[in-house]
């Protein structure tokens, strides 16, 4: 089962490494990881997406709470949350493909953020199924 775990941890060198090392040492997989400072510049928020049974997630949570840098651990999966995915895709766009890629970006409410002679870089935001549908449509 997919779980999203949110951590508050001290914003200091090596804190990220220790959290990732804990996952690696115990054979847990991190599917997605986001880290950013909070309004309190001494703290960072880390959001981790992982898979595991409730027992495995409980073990992960216990291990994370033992790390000195970790201030708070919350399994967001237990409550209501909104999940969005940001996708950057570089696509070939030559000749007639250029107009087709512009049209596809519009249909999926994406933005062209970079243009070269032979390609576009597109930015799409949405749920996983929307972004997957875009990839299938341009394939």
Where are these regions (language model features)?
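A conserved regulatory-domain signal marking ACT and ACT-like small-molecule sensing domains
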Residues: 1-139
